[in-house]
C-alpha cells in the first residue's frame, strides 16, 4: 500500500477561489466605509447602508471578513461583514484613515473627539490619481498623453 500525501490546503483554496468576490475596493482598518447590504422585506429587496470605521479585517480567502463600527444615537454599533457574502451589494470608501494598528478595538473605549482618526492624505492623493487615470483610460486619449506627445513633437522639430 502506497501512502499518498494530499495537500488539503491547496484543494480547499481551489474550491474557494470560485466563491471569492473581487469587486470590493481596497480598504484598510481606519478607513470610513459605506456598506450597502441587500435586505429582503416580504417579496421585495432593498439596499440598506451601514456607514462607519473599519476596525478590523479578519481571515483569508472566502472566510475573510471586516468589522465596521459606528455611533448610532449615542450607542456604539458594530457589524461584521463577510467579503464574499452575496448580501453585500456594494462597499464604498468615503475617507482614508491613518492608523498604526491592524485592530482598532481601543476605539470602543474612546468617546467624542478622542475617537477621531486622522486622514491619510497620501492615500487620498494616490486614490485621486488612480481615479484620474481610470477616467482618462475610459475616454481613450488622455490629456497627459496628448501633452507629452505634443512636447515630444516640439523637441523633435528643433
Swiss-Prot record:
Any one GO biological process: translation
A Gene Ontology cellular-component term: cytosolic large ribosomal subunit
MF (Gene Ontology): structural constituent of ribosome
Ranges of biased composition (kind: Polar residues): 140-158
Region of interest called Disordered, as start-end residue ranges on this chain: 119-158
Keyword Ribonucleoprotein: yes
Ranges annotated as biased composition (Basic and acidic residues): 119-129
Protein origin, superkingdom: Bacteria
PROSITE patterns the record matches: RIBOSOMAL_L19
The keyword rRNA processing is assigned to this record: no
Biased composition (Low complexity): 130-139
Keywords from the UniProt entry: Ribonucleoprotein, Ribosomal protein
Family recorded in the similarity comment: Belongs to the bacterial ribosomal protein bL19 family.
Function: This protein is located at the 30S-50S ribosomal subunit interface and may play a role in the structure and function of the aminoacyl-tRNA binding site.
Protein name: Large ribosomal subunit protein bL19
Organism: Deinococcus geothermalis (strain DSM 11300 / CIP 105573 / AG-3a)
Amino acid at each position: 500500500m502506497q501512502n499518498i500525501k494530499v495537500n488539503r490546503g491547496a484543494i480547499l483554496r481551489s474550491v474557494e477561489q470560485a466563491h471569492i468576490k473581487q469587486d470590493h475596493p481596497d480598504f484598510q482598518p481606519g478607513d470610513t466605509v459605506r456598506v450597502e447590504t441587500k435586505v429582503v422585506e416580504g417579496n421585495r429587496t432593498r439596499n440598506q447602508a451601514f456607514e462607519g470605521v473599519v476596525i478590523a479585517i479578519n481571515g483569508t480567502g472566502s472566510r475573510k471578513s471586516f468589522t465596521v463600527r459606528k455611533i448610532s444615537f449615542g450607542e456604539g454599533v458594530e457589524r461584521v461583514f463577510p467579503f464574499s457574502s452575496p448580501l453585500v451589494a456594494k462597499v464604498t470608501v468615503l475617507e482614508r484613515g491613518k492608523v498604526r494598528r491592524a485592530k482598532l478595538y481601543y476605539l470602543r473605549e474612546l468617546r467624542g473627539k478622542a475617537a477621531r482618526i486622522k486622514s491619510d492624505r497620501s492615500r487620498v492623493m494616490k486614490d485621486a490619481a488612480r481615479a484620474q487615470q481610470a477616467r482618462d483610460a475610459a475616454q481613450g486619449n488622455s490629456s497627459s498623453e496628448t501633452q507629452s506627445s505634443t512636447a515630444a513633437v516640439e523637441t523633435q522639430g528643433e
